[in-house]
Every structure is written in C-alpha cells, then in structure tokens.
UniProtKB/Swiss-Prot annotation:
The keyword rRNA processing applies. It comes from Candida dubliniensis (strain CD36 / ATCC MYA-646 / CBS 7987 / NCPF 3949 / NRRL Y-17841) (Yeast). The gene is UTP25. Keywords: Nucleus, Ribonucleoprotein, Ribosome biogenesis, rRNA processing. The keyword Ribonucleoprotein applies. DEAD-box RNA helicase-like protein required for pre-18S rRNA processing, specifically at sites A0, A1, and A2. This is U3 small nucleolar RNA-associated protein 25. Residues 1-72, 85-159 are annotated as: Disordered. Residues 15-26, 34-43 have a biased composition (Basic and acidic residues).
C-alpha cells in the first residue's frame, strides 16, 4: 500500500515540530508574525477554545482565531520529513460546551500532518481499470457508437474530444501569446433571482457546446447513475436559480458565482454532480476505447484513440476547512451511487467533529468555524463501479480535495527532490468553494497552487503516450480546463481567478447579485447615524495604497480631534495589514496620540488589556484590523467615532462596525447625533462601495465632482 505521512519526532524539539507548518502560513502573508512566547491561551487559535473567563465576558470576549505561532527559524524547517513518513491516524477530543480539536501535543497530533496526503504511487491501484468489457456501466449500451450527433450534443465530447490540433494552436496564439481581449457577448438580468450574468468568449473562434437550458435535469447529458442518485435525493425539477447555474457548469464554461449568504448551499450539489458526471464519463470513455483497441488488435487493425491525460486525477476541489471537505465528500458519496466506501471511519475520525462556536456569535461566523475547522488537509478519492476509496494515492485518484495551504506544502517542499506536483498536470475541472474564507486564511497559497495546475509533469508515471490527448502533450490543457469559483462576495483576488488565471475556450460566465439602495448593507444597519464618505484622488490601483496613506496622514489625522465630538472612543478600522503597520508606525513616531493597536497576531493578553483600556477611556484611539475581526468577531466597547481607512471586503463587517457605536449609544456613553462614521475611498473601490451603498449610488460617489457625501 502507498505510504501515508506523519511527522518524525526523533531528534526534533517541540518548537521545531510546529515551526514548518506555522511559518509556511506566515511567510507569504502580508507581514511577518510577531514572535510570541506567551502561553497557549495567548495565541490567536481558530481551532481551540471559544470559551471566556468571567472578566472577559464583561466586554464580550469570545475566543476564536488562529493558532499561536512561533516565528523562529527558517520557513518550512520542520517539514522536510513530511513526504517520507508514515501517517498516524489520530482522533479528535470533543469537550462539551466548546470547540475542542485536540492540539495539546502538536508533536503527536494528526492535526500537524496534512490529513489524507498520499503522493506515492501504488502499482496495484490501477488494476480495476484494466480492460473489462463487463465493467462499463449498463447505461453505456446506448452510447457505443460515437455518432456525429452524440459528439456534438454532449458537452463533454465537444469540449475535450472534438477540438483539433490546428484549432488549439491558433487559439493558443490569440489567448496566451498575443493576449487578445475577450469579448462580452451577452448580459442578462434575472429580476426574479436578483442576479445578473455576463458571458465572455475568447478571441477567435470559441468552442460552441450545446446550450440547453431546462428546469429538468434529465434533459441534460448526465450519467445515469449520477442522475438517478440526484433525482432520488432532490427530485427531478430544478429551481430557477439551479437551472440558470447548471447550464454553464455542464457546458464546461468557467463560472464565477456569488451566493450572497452562507445559507445558499444549493450550488454545491450542482458542482458535485458535475464533478462525478465528468469522472464517470472519462472512465467510461477510457474503458470503451480500451475494448475497441483490443478488438482492433485481434483484427490486426491500427487505431489511435486518445482519451487520457498524463495522470489520472481530473478534478481538484479547494476548500477552507476539514469540515467543509467533510460536507463535500458526503455529497459526493450521496450522488455517486457507490455501495461501499473504503476508509470511511478513518475519514470521519480525521474530518468530522460535532462542535460549534458559541450561540451568541453571528450565524455566518458559526457556519465558518463549526466542526473541524483545521485548514490543513489534502485527500484523494478514487471511484470504481461500485465503490469509493478515500485516501487513495494522488496518482490513482479521480478527485482531489485540499486546502490551499495543505496542497502548497506538497507542491513547494524546500527540498526540490521531494517536490510533488505531477498529479495536478491533468486537472480538467478546478473548483474553488468558499473563497472568502480561503482569502482570510491566506490567498497566496491559492496563487501557489495555480502555478502548478496543468503544468507538464517532470516524470510521466508509466503513462501510455498513445492514449494521451495531444492538447495535453502540447501543454494546452489550460485552454480546456474549466474553473468554477464560488464566493459570498467578490474581491479583486477572487475575480482574478476567472479574469486572468483562466483561459477556457468555452468561455466565462460571471454571476453578480443585484444590490440596490434598498437591499444594500447601509440600509440594513438600523441606526440613523451620520456616515460621511470621503473620496481621495488615486491615479491607479498600484498607487492607491500610497495615495490613501498620504491623504490620511495629511487630511484626516490633523483634523481628527476637531471633527470628532469626542476626544476618546476613536476607532480606526484598517482592512490591510500592510496599511495597518504603516499607520501604526506613523502614530508612534510622528504624533502624540494616546493609542492602542490590536491585530490578528496580537497575544490574547494584549487583546484583552487593550480593549479594556480603550473601553475605559485610558486609550483614546484604537487601531483594529479586518482579519482580527474575521477571526474573533469582537463587539468593541467604547466606540464613539469610527474611521474606516478603507471599506471592509465583507459587507457584513460594515454593519457590525457601525453597531459598535450603537452599543455605546445604548449604554448612554455617547449621543447618536454626535457620533460619526467616516469612510475613505477612491474610484478603485467601486466594487466594495457597491456592496455598501448599492449600484445606483456607487457610480455617483466614484465619478461625480463632489468628493464628500453624507448619509444617515
């Protein structure tokens, strides 16, 4: 059997054991983590205790965050043994009343491993795919003939098997080398769904799959075993949103879909259905062609049938936590129709924890951090006719599910001889779900993974070159790879996955929620508080951070005490950690403000002390970062004036931050008419601005002559 991984312990200190994974997290983040030598409770640990002591309850202290990190040593220094060690399975300890993923002994805990990682090849794992004419699904009897009609009406065939070498060479030049502009060919508004769609096609001649749109799933070309399982679980009829979304997904177009709320989960059953449909069609195509080749060999005929990539893995699904992976795997099991799941108990032990954050946290927070919220996993799934194998070798897997950090640790091992990335060479469907959670963890790891997807392998792993498609051999797989991106709200980094990192010749479809003044976040605050939007000039997105900083220190800070009705209770919210460090340094060296600062890397003792001093008025001004708010969701006491250095990426945070002032008003610590919210923005903030004020107001604020706007 293929070996699994665990961390070696001989001769390695406890600090060194933890260092590799921890420093990988921080080395590409926006700034280096401060060294922390405090005890366990001083760390920002998402996975550990949510409970509070009595003193902290008075200021709404609930603990969620990232693990306490040790900064000493070189990045990755303790990870050199990962790719040659045995994996040791560990169970989780669940303590009633709080979320407890057992990390009390990092050297022994499976949480310090990449759960599911298995990159070694097993020669026996491919035996079930040998020629077996009886192994083809029963539904295939009606698909034996590759008629022109079938090839042209099945998106799988028209997308992956019909494009010619000449066509792909021509499109490669236009799309990748000349970088010609994509054309917008269709814009639609679905008023009943409060959604708009935008369709973009590549330059030249796009692949034209059959564009069927139906509310009945059985009218699409879906494998019978998947279709039957889906209809048994969810019925034959699709909702309006599902029928709108399933069309571009099944037609192998790239999709960027904003689901608006964590409660909207129906899209997940659609992409799992699509992933299984793709896997089973690929498998059946290979088995049929193998049977044809055997028959031709007996008749002394020569056939060229190309139906494979360099490696077996065809679908990659990136997710933020083990709990989210558990949910997707359960969905795959439900729709696959498999009668047996190998290693299911082991999977449940490593990926499932029945626990949740406290009930007084926001619902979206409870959803994000429920269950096993470790962001450290990478697991392969292999499907056969009647069974599913979990923890299959990556080179024998059909689907790989991974967190970006877990996958990047395999892709970029500091020892170049131990790096593994060939198993991503033949990915044909890439799915990135819950992108906003991943972005708050560390988006750099997504960029790392994207560098290796569809990269020509350094070794060929016994591949049969007579069966490999020419577009794989010619390094053109990226032109046919489908990318599906699902997020709650759009950010520039997430948008770039489709806009600049995807080159799918079938085109791209971007779905966008309609946000007007009525359903904008500003309209849901529930407080008649003065909100001033202040625009500053910025020549380009690259120059925007410098322009924002100069405007802040020259125009906002000098008049801060004059414009505020209160000399204390001033909070400055800063989304970017880079900007936070810059402003913090300026306040420390160039002003006489009595200020405090807390961020996602602050120790627990500092977080508690600073918040208490700010609430009591001892500290007049407080710097507060977006990632700290994401991981903790504090309700800061004592806020009377709120300055937003930039708009939060999550629109919910806008409402929560302003309600800090509402809390002070309720406690009669300030007057609602005297409280103030001021927001800095530039024309490059249009996407974020639209989420706050609506699509009618945002263009006015960005482009009109006035630079200052007041709302209540």
């Amino acid at each position: 059997m293929a070996k699994q991984f665990k961390r070696k312990s001989n001769g390695v200190s406890e600090n060194n054991r933890k260092r590799g994974r921890q420093e990988l997290r921080k080395v590409t983040r926006t700034a280096a983590r401060k060294q922390q030598d405090e005890s366990h409770e001083d760390g920002l640990d998402v996975n550990n205790n949510f409970e509070e002591d009595n003193a902290e309850e008075e200021i709404d202290e609930e603990e969620v965050g990232e693990q306490d990190y040790d900064d000493r040593g070189k990045a990755y220094s303790a990870l050199l043994t990962l790719l040659k060690s045995e994996h040791k399975e560990k169970s989780k300890n669940v303590t009633s009343g709080s979320l407890q993923v057992d990390r009390t002994n990092p050297s022994d805990s499976e949480d310090e491993e990449i759960a599911g990682a298995n990159v070694e090849e097993d020669e026996n794992e491919g035996e079930d795919e040998n020629v077996d004419e009886n192994g083809i699904d029963s539904e295939s009897d009606n698909e034996d003939e590759d008629t022109v009609n079938r090839l042209s009406t099945d998106p799988f065939e028209s997308h992956f098997n019909l494009p010619t070498e000449d066509y792909l060479a021509k499109e490669e030049k236009l799309v990748l080398k000349d970088n010609e502009k994509w054309c917008t060919v269709d814009k639609r508004t679905y008023s009943d769904l409060a959604v708009t769609s935008l369709v973009q096609l590549p330059p030249g001649e796009p692949i034209n799959p059959p564009l069927l749109k139906s509310s009945k799933l059985n009218e699409y070309t879906i494998k019978k075993r998947v279709l039957d399982s889906y209809q048994q679980a969810y019925g034959a009829e699709l909702t309006d949103l599902e029928s709108t979304l399933i069309n571009p997904i099944l037609n192998y177009r790239d999709v960027n879909f904003q689901y608006k709320s964590f409660k909207n989960k129906s899209y997940r059953k659609l992409y799992t259905l699509h992933a299984l449909n793709h896997i089973f069609k690929t498998r059946d195509r290979i088995l049929k062609n193998t049977a044809k080749l055997h028959a031709a060999k007996e008749d002394s005929e020569e056939l060229e049938l190309r139906d494979q990539g360099f490696t077996r893995s065809k679908v990659l699904i990136m997710l933020p936590t083990r709990d989210s992976c558990y949910e997707v795997v359960e969905q795959l099991i439900k729709l696959s129709g498999t009668e047996q799941q190998e290693n299911k108990k082991k999977f449940n032990d490593q990926f499932y924890v029945k626990a949740a954050p406290p009930a007084n946290k926001p619902d979206d927070f409870r959803d994000a951090f429920k269950g096993n919220n470790s962001d450290f996993f990478c697991i392969g799934l292999k499907f056969t006719r009647k069974s599913l194998k979990l923890y299959s070798s990556f080179y024998s897997s059909d689907i790989i599910l991974a967190s970006p950090i877990g996958l990047s640790m395999i892709l970029e091992n500091p020892d170049k001889k131990k790096r593994q990335y060939d198993f991503l060479s033949s990915i044909e469907v890439l799915i990135v779900d819950r992108c906003n959670q991943i972005e708050m963890q560390n988006w750099d790891h997504v960029n790392t993974v994207m560098k290796y997807v569809n990269k020509v392998p350094k070794e060929f792993h016994d591949a049969d070159f007579s069966r490999i498609r020419m577009w794989s051999i010619n390094d053109q797989a990226k032109l046919l790879r489908q990318t599906l991106v699902f997020c709650e709200y759009l950010t520039p980094s997430i948008n770039n996955l489709i806009s600049s990192k995807s080159h799918n010749l079938s085109g791209k479809v971007k779905f966008k929620p309609i946000i007007n003044s009525e359903n904008s976040m500003m309209n849901s605050i529930g407080l008649k508080i003065k909100q001033i939007f202040q625009r500053f000039d910025s020549q380009s997105p690259l120059q925007d951070p410098d322009a924002r900083y100069k405007y802040f220190i020259n125009a906002i800070l000098p008049s801060l005490l004059k414009t505020s009705s209160y000399e204390d209770g001033i909070m400055i919210f800063i989304p970017s950690y880079f900007d936070y460090l810059r402003v913090k340094n300026y306040l420390k060296t160039s002003t006489k403000f009595t200020f405090g600062s807390i961020d996602e890397y602050s120790s627990q003792s500092k977080l508690t002390k600073t918040r208490q001093e700010f609430a009591s008025g001892k500290i007049k001004l407080l710097l507060y970062t977006e990632r700290l708010h994401y991981f903790r969701r504090y309700e800061i006491s004592g806020v009377k004036t709120l300055i937003m250095y930039g708009l939060p990426s999550n629109p919910l945070f806008y409402k929560e931050l302003i309600r800090f002032i509402g809390k002070s008003v309720f406690k009669e610590e300030c007057d609602l008419d005297l409280a103030l919210v001021k927001i800095l923005f530039s024309k490059w903030d249009a996407v974020n601005l639209e989420k706050m004020v609506g699509n009618e107001r945002a263009p006015v604020l960005c482009n009109s002559m006035n630079e200052l706007y007041e709302f209540r």
